[in-house]
């Protein structure tokens, strides 16, 4: 069988094997893993002499491991595995001159031995560490650890055991953690002294020998120190050995592998300081280890001092020392923060903080961002501590300036692009993203500094900005773009402090000292020669700052023309990233400064004319497999067009400034509209013939038209009176052409989803420009937007738009709504009735149901309910009621059910006539006359619905959403009672409630409560009543 297993492993691992044979081999090996006797064959294969191939042995041992972990090997058999492997280890690792296994096999054996340790150390293998330590001698009579093969294997197992039971980063179940804790306790009692002594012996005997042995020993000490007696590591013998290894840092040249030994020695000190202990003990430990001296000596070593700013700089060592600094300072700050710590301890901690400040600054200001990032946590802790101190005692804030100022200067300097940065290169996108993430973290630290000492922060940033602009004034384009970018970035962040009161100005004056400084900075920037901003990064920053602090221009309106001119130049930037961002920022700026801009419309339209030419491009076939959507990719054609739309809106804003006469507004609008109309006409024929690019071109044209309209007026129904927000009648008339052009395209191409999407977008924007002028066209819009192929999602979105139209024009829409309601709702009913397939479909169906009910509520709440029961729409009335009844009984969709009851209550209020029962307060009032027979209709059709939903088998009356639905159902019953009075009470008493099997006493309690409580009271009562019944 061994030969058969070996053969199967060879076939499975051979890339040239026949696929059928390989599949059979994999099936066989998978069966072997679950076979209770399979591990025995594999154990024999692994220990066989002469040995099998490395691959066979690796897979064989993997099967043994798998069987052991799956519980297929009982305790007695685990002992057998132990004995076989121990014999193998003694033969291969326990004597000199044998041929060692490759590292992957050694790791696999160490993994198996670690599992056996977990299972047997407390249950039959008490000599575990003695057995392993015996491998470290060449012979039983040897008194030194002189067998390198055995030592390396022993250390592999030691480190593997820590990973299994001591590594806090490993996620374990509660049972696994309890077992790990028990094993650690057992080791501490039985063997810990012996293990610690072995580390000392190995380090002592091999300190100048095998670097791998020393490195593995140091890693073992560093990992185990977190859960063993600290005295086993922090003693003179061990510390002398550790300091000897730290001495390697002083070497200018290291042999291969020696740097890992040095770094591992530093890591041991980091782990010692990271060990959990009382704050007082930790401070004493830091002082005892003289870590200030340790860090200082390594920092001044050739790899970190002489080689700094050269290609030989050792970033690995710098990061390793930075970890030690970070851990140490974090614990120093923790001691300072604890209120229970003694004054003497705090004094010591303060002293340590002062001596460690140069080390913090050294690594925080390191040229390499990964080194700087390593100490950010301790800098954050330190600054947060100082903020807490300053908050409790503001008078001491200035005392911390000796700490704050150098940290702040380091923060500012680290925010500068380094000399190797090449901004904007596609190849450097990852580096750029990482740098921006670092800037964000540094910005957070800077804000903490500002919170501790705002004046110090204000002075430091002001100095950087003022010096930079002065240098730019003197040297112009000679200024390094990185310095200007830094100053602008600091200006951008400064606003967090300058505008914390809510705005830059208060009654025309800067809102505080920081705001005053920011105004000074803005003046320096805006009055600078834009031509000095030669780098794309600084050009972008310039625009971002102008937009962020646009309120600055409210009191410096004379600067607006120059800024607009700068933006128009940058809108033509040769770099696409800058250009498209400029389009967006230009729109933001003119929107915020609309009331302060003079008549520059003609200049702007002429300057941007070449950028308003629309050129649709179909996505390339190669982009189909790209995981990133085209809209996310700033260089994609979709993203460029989306940015271009901002220009159309900006043009609309500038052309509709109130100071421009209406006839001029029309002229400017037509200068933009006409080329788009011509383009649509030119492409319509091809689009009808199925030309995909022509369809996309018309989609883009319609989107542009709608966006231009939004620029002229962003009024939305319901926000304010249209009379005060709509453009002049002449302008509205000009945009009627937009509506007509869009409808012509939509009517020709309504089978296209993209055209419907663009048209719906344009419709929503045109409402704000046309007002009630759009109403006569509503039937055409509905016909084009709600087709046989329209999705539920499209219908829901359009229903939402119609709600706005109804709200905005309720006094003018009745006749149009009366004419279009029946065909419109028939399409909605069709969409609701269509079968669903998949989760997305279910979501869209639920959304359509809710928007349909919202639409009915909009009609009823705006006194247009008569349209539902008009002579023209009467044939559809029963279908409307039936759909609502169906939704009200849906226990799978409580949100829709709740809305359905709301609609029925609103119908009752609208058509049930005047209230005849008392205590109907806090319900919706209505002045509408009664609909003949509707009262009886409510009793027989609406009332039973209140009981149908809770009668559903899956209904849970205690569910929070279910309670909300029941409250609405209770509200409906109270509405029926308010309209029908005793007639409804008698119906409940004589027919409905007894028909459900309710006893006479319960019926009387129920109808008595209904007649006694008001609407709010009964809404609360009904869910409680249903809970009682269900219990």
UniProtKB/Swiss-Prot annotation:
Organism for this UniProt entry: Emericella nidulans (strain FGSC A4 / ATCC 38163 / CBS 112.46 / NRRL 194 / M139) (Aspergillus nidulans)
InterPro entries named in the record: ARM-like, ARM-type_fold, Exportin-1/Importin-b-like, Exportin-T_C, XPOT
Keyword Cell division included in the entry's annotation: no
Name of the protein this chain belongs to: Exportin-T
Pfam families: Exportin-T (PF19282), Xpo1 (PF08389)
GO biological process, one term: tRNA processing
Predominant cellular place of this UniProt entry's protein: nucleus
Molecular function terms, GO-annotated: small GTPase binding; tRNA binding
Function: tRNA nucleus export receptor which facilitates tRNA translocation across the nuclear pore complex. Involved in pre-tRNA splicing, probably by affecting the interaction of pre-tRNA with splicing endonuclease.
Any GO CC annotation of this UniProt entry: nuclear matrix
UniProt similarity note: Belongs to the exportin family.
UniProt superkingdom: Eukaryota
PANTHER family noted in UniProt: EXPORTIN-T, EXPORTIN-T/LOS1
Transmembrane segments: none
Keyword annotations: Cytoplasm, Nucleus, RNA-binding, Transport, tRNA processing, tRNA-binding
Alphabetical list of Gene3D superfamilies matching this protein: Leucine-rich Repeat Variant
Compartments, record wording: Nucleus; Cytoplasm
């Amino acid at each position: 069988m061994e030969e058969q297993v070996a053969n199967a492993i060879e076939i499975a691992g051979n890339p040239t094997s026949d696929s059928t044979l390989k599949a059979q081999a994999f099936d066989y090996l998978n069966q072997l893993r679950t076979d209770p006797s399979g591990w025995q064959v594999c154990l024999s294969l692994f220990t066989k002499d002469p040995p099998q191939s490395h691959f066979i042995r690796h897979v064989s041992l993997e099967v043994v491991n798998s069987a052991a972990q799956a519980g297929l090997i009982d305790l007695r058999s685990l002992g057998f595995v132990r004995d076989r492997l121990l014999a193998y280890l003694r033969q291969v690792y326990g004597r000199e001159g044998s041929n060692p296994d490759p590292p992957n096999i050694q790791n696999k054996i160490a993994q198996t031995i670690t599992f056996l340790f977990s299972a047997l150390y407390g249950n039959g293998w008490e000599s575990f560490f003695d057995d392993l330590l015996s491998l470290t001698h060449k012979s039983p009579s040897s008194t030194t650890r002189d067998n390198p093969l055995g030592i390396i294997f022993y250390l592999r197992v030691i480190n593997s055991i820590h990973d299994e039971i001591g590594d806090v980063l490993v996620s374990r179940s509660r049972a696994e953690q309890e077992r790990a804790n028990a094993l650690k306790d057992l080791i501490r009692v039985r063997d810990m002294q012996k293990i610690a002594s072995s580390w000392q012996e190995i380090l002592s005997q091999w300190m100048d020998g095998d670097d791998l042995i020393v490195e593995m020993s140091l890693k073992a000490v560093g990992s185990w120190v977190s859960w063993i007696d600290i005295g086993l590591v922090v003693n003179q013998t061990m510390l002398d050995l550790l300091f000897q290894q730290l001495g390697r840092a002083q070497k200018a040249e290291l042999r291969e592998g020696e740097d890992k030994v040095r770094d591992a020695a530093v890591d041991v000190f980091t782990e010692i300081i990271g060990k959990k202990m009382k704050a007082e003990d930790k401070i004493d430990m830091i002082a005892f280890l003289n870590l200030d001296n340790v860090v200082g000596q390594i920092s001044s070593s050739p790899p970190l001092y002489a080689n700094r700013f050269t290609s030989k700089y050792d970033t690995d060592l710098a990061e390793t020392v930075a970890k030690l600094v970070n851990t140490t300072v974090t614990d120093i700050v923790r001691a300072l923060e604890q209120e229970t710590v003694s004054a003497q301890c705090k004094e010591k901690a303060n002293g340590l903080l002062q001596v460690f400040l140069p080390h913090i600054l050294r690594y925080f200001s390191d040229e390499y961002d990964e080194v700087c990032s390593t100490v950010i946590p301790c800098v954050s802790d330190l600054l947060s501590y100082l903020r807490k101190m300053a908050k409790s005692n503001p008078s001491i804030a200035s005392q911390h300036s000796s700490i704050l100022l150098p940290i702040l200067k380091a923060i500012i300097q680290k925010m500068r692009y380094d000399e190797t940065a090449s901004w904007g290169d596609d190849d450097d996108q990852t580096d750029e993203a990482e740098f921006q993430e670092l800037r964000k973290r540094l910005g957070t630290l800077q804000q903490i500094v500002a919170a501790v000492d705002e004046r110090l922060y204000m002075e430091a940033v002001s100095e950087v900005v003022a010096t930079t602009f002065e240098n730019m004034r003197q040297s112009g384009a000679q200024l390094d773009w990185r310095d200007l970018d830094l100053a602008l970035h600091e200006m951008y962040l400064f606003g967090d402090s300058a505008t914390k009161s809510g705005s830059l100005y208060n009654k025309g004056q800067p809102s505080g000292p920081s705001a005053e400084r920011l105004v000074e900075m803005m003046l320096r920037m805006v009055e600078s020669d834009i031509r000095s901003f030669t780098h794309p990064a600084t050009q972008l920053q310039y625009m971002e700052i102008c937009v962020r602090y646009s309120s600055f221009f409210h009191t410096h309106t004379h600067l607006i023309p120059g800024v607009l001119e700068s933006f128009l130049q940058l809108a033509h930037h040769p770099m696409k990233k800058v250009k498209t961002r400029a389009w967006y920022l230009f729109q933001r700026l003119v929107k915020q400064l609309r009331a302060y801009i003079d008549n520059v419309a003609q200049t702007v339209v002429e300057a941007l004319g070449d950028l308003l030419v629309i050129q649709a491009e179909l996505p390339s076939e190669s982009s189909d497999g790209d995981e990133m959507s085209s809209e996310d990719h700033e260089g994609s054609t979709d993203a460029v067009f989306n940015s271009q739309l901002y220009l159309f809106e900006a043009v609309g804003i500038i052309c509709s400034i109130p100071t421009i006469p209406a006839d001029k507004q029309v002229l400017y609008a037509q200068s933009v509209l006409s080329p788009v109309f011509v383009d649509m006409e030119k492409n319509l024929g091809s689009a009808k013939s199925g030309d995909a690019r022509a369809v996309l071109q018309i989609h883009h044209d319609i989107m542009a038209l709608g966006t231009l309209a939004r620029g002229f007026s962003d009024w939305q129904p319901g926000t304010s009176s249209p009379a005060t927000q709509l453009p002049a009648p002449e302008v509205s008339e000009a945009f009627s052409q937009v509506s007509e052009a869009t409808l012509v395209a939509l009517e020709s191409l309504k089978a296209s989803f993209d055209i419907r999407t663009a048209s719906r977008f344009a419709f929503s924007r045109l409402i704000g420009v046309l007002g009630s002028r759009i109403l006569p066209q509503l039937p055409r819009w509905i016909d084009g937007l709600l087709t046989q192929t329209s999705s539920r999602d499209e219908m829901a979105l359009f229903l939402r738009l119609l709600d706005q139209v109804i709200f905005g024009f309720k006094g003018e829409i009745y006749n149009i709504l009366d004419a279009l309601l029946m065909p419109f709702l028939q399409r909605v009913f069709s969409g609701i009735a269509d079968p669903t397939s998949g989760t997305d479909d279910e979501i869209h169906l639920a959304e359509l149901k809710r928007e349909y009910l919202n639409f009915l509520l909009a009609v009823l709440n705006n006194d247009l309910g008569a349209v539902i029961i008009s002579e023209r729409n009467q044939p559809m009335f029963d279908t409307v009621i039936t759909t609502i009844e169906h939704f009200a009984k849906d226990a799978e969709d409580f949100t829709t059910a709740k809305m359905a009851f709301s609609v029925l209550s609103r119908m009752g209020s609208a058509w049930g006539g005047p209230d005849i029962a008392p205590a109907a307060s806090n319900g919706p009032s209505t002045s509408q006359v009664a609909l003949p027979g509707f009262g009886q209709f409510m009793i027989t059709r609406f009332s039973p619905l209140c009981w149908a939903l809770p009668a559903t088998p899956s209904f849970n009356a205690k569910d929070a959403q279910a309670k909300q639905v029941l409250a609405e159902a209770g509200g409906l019953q109270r509405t029926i009672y308010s309209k029908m009075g005793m007639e409804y009470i008698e119906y409940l008493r004589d027919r409905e409630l007894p028909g459900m099997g309710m006893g006479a006493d319960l019926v009387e309690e129920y109808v008595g409560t209904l007649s006694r409580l008001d609407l709010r009271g009964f809404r609360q009562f009904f869910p409680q009543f249903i809970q009682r019944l269900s219990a």
